[in-house]
């Protein structure tokens, strides 16, 4: 049994910000402050006992047809490789919790290909908080030099969590954020995909060996060759690694072999 969380936007973001948000909605004439406050204070179940029970009950129906077949001639316009691998009959019409309902009407258990798309399951009820945020006009579009309060708060919470700091302990938080000691986790880079995260980590390592441009100081390990450890496959090669979507990371799993070999031959 999971311990259900039931929270509101106000619980997460604080009364001061919500107060400013409600007043801003009123100023725009979108809704009055009282209506906005009601939305902001609505407590949302993340994973209720009812949903947990349904999730458990559906397990026995995996692989069985539980709904009518959806038939369509629409094949899309993917590349030949994607089209060859595609399985329309297993494609989701909808989903719930740990399951998806295929076009063939069968119930499928969320598997490997969905693991990072649905970490909280399909139709996660906690996302109703996002619906409420949209109704209140909490903006998603922004830029690095105008990161909104929500983004800044989440960065702070991540640093606190990574360092075992209570949210209310502002003194310890300020000390960690100001630290320049090595191996202190006190910075957050906002990225939306796994590929970009891998690329960022890769560049952080390269920056210790090579200058990004002429304005940068000489790196700590200038003149040395960076070495990256990768996961071997069952054939003794490197094709078992994460594929990535950028050229350099793809070379880590044996792709672009001529490019990779040329880099190695030239000491890169």
What is the meaning of each model-derived region?
Residues 2-23, 31, 92, 103, ...:
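PLP-dependent aspartate aminotransferase-fold enzymes
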Residues 8-20, 26-101, 108-109, 113-119, ...:
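Active-site-adjacent loop/helix segments that line or gate small-molecule/cofactor pockets in enzymes
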Residues 136-144, 183-188:
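Glycine- and acidic
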Residues 146-154, 193-198:
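Phosphate/oxyanion-binding active-site loops and adjacent basic polyanion-contact surfaces
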């Amino acid at each position: 049994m999971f311990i259900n969380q039931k929270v509101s936007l106000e619980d997460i973001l604080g009364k001061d910000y919500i107060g400013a948000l409600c007043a801003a909605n009123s100023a725009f004439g979108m809704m009055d402050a009282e209506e906005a406050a009601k939305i902001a204070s609505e407590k949302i179940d993340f994973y209720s006992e009812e949903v947990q029970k349904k999730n458990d009950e559906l397990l026995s129906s995996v692989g069985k047809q539980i709904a009518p077949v959806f038939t369509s001639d629409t094949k899309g316009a993917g590349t030949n490789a994607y089209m060859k691998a595609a399985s329309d009959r297993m494609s989701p019409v909808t989903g719930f919790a740990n399951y998806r309902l295929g076009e063939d009407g069968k119930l499928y258990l969320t598997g490997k290909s969905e693991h990072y798309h649905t970490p909280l399951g399909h139709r996660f009820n906690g996302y109703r908080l996002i619906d409420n945020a949209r109704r209140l006009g909490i903006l998603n579009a922004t830029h690095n030099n105008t990161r909104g309060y929500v983004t800044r708060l989440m960065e702070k919470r991540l640093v606190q969590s990574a360092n075992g700091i209570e949210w209310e302990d502002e003194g310890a938080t300020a000390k960690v954020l100001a630290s320049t000691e090595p191996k202190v986790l006190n910075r957050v880079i906002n990225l939306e995909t796994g590929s970009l995260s891998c690329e960022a980590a890769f560049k952080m390592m390269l920056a210790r060996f090579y200058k990004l441009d002429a304005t940068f100081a000489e790196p700590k390990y200038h003149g040395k060759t960076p070495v990256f450890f990768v996961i071997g496959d069952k054939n003794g090669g490197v094709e078992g690694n994460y594929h990535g979507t950028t050229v350099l990371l793809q070379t880590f799993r044996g792709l672009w072999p001529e490019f990779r070999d040329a880099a190695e031959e030239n000491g890169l």
